[in-house]
Amino acid sequence: KRNTRAYEFQKGPANQKSFGCIAATHKNLSGKDAAATKMAAKGTCVMALMTGEQYVESMRKLNLQVYMFGKKIENPVDDPILRPSLNSVKATYDLAQDPEYADLMTAKSILTGETINRFTHIHQSTDDLIKKVKMQRLCGQKTAACFQRCVGMDAFNAVYSTTYETDEKYGTHYHENFKKFLQYVQEHDYTVDGAMTDPKGDRSLPPHLQADPDLYLRVVERRPDGIVVRGAKAHQTGFVNSHEVIVMPTQAMGEDDKDYAVAFAVPTDAKGIFMIVGRQSCDTRKLEGSEIDVGNSQFGGTEALVIFDDVFVPNDRIFLNGENEFAGVLVERFAGYHR
């Protein structure tokens, strides 16, 4: 199951070719996706956009290490407790295919000029920000649940500008790394989780003075071809339903915490990543065969404690690596978008 994804990850986004814009009357869409055909008739490129069902099938291909109630979940996509949360993300793909909502749910990529899901867009104007809010409101109205893509979207925009400023000061290549990663995400129409919150431990102490040095995610090895990271990210909304994750520092970092000032992206099924799913209200009611007290039976959310057990990150997926003064900048910028 991992062969294709692992190969793409090792090659890196720089070698991925653009899907381009192919007519939506292609045999794979003709007669099967009327909404996409209508959008194509209006001159809108839809070939880079997955349908909801295509998103679901793409998640089946991942080799996710998911644990819940003390057991490994072999099939997260069809698990009755997890499936409503997957349906919420699926709705963001279905709505993007609907001509009625195309103006809110899609945007033109600043990297390729092609039509993309707005959840992967870099805001360019006040109008973009207004449409972002209206899109989020629409998704909330359609699902009455958490649709799990907001953190990733806000991470894109925070990392985009922060990497540019870091490169200006240090001559690094983080901004180019990020743009290539973002183009890869847009062309594949992937869902990306944003991971910021660490377990933290004693909050009166900085990361390097914690009793356990891994209570904040950190770099434990620097190699010629990349870095190795260890630690965890807590309360990760939608990680189980994402293709990729952007990891960011959780707070401003001092000189002694350079190893904790790290930002990067990896596939959610990268070797060494483990997800421990937390409880939801009334979640086991879904297993009782009754509609009583199941809450929102069709849609939902999910959170997980995500463990990074010596995960390798190649150089072209690194967006911050020890430049500690930009950790706080990134966190503050993200908060401005997110809150």
Indicate where each model-derived feature is located.
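Intrinsic-disorder-associated, low-complexity terminal segments enriched in Asp/Asn/His/Tyr and depleted
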Residues: 3, 15, 26-28
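Aromatic (phenylalanine/tyrosine) cluster motif
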Residues: 7-9, 19
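Short, low-complexity intrinsically disordered segments enriched in A/P/G/S/L with frequent Arg
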Residues: 19, 23-24, 34-35
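Acidic/polar, glycine-rich intrinsically disordered N-terminal extensions of enzymes
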Residues: 47-109
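Internal helix-loop-helix
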Residues: 94-192, 244
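Glycine-rich, mobile lid/loop segments that gate access to catalytic sites or pores
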Residues: 163-228, 232-239, 244, 255-257
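A short core secondary-structure module
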Residues: 232, 236-287
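Glycine-rich beta->alpha junctions and the first turn(s) of the following alpha-helix
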Residues: 289-339
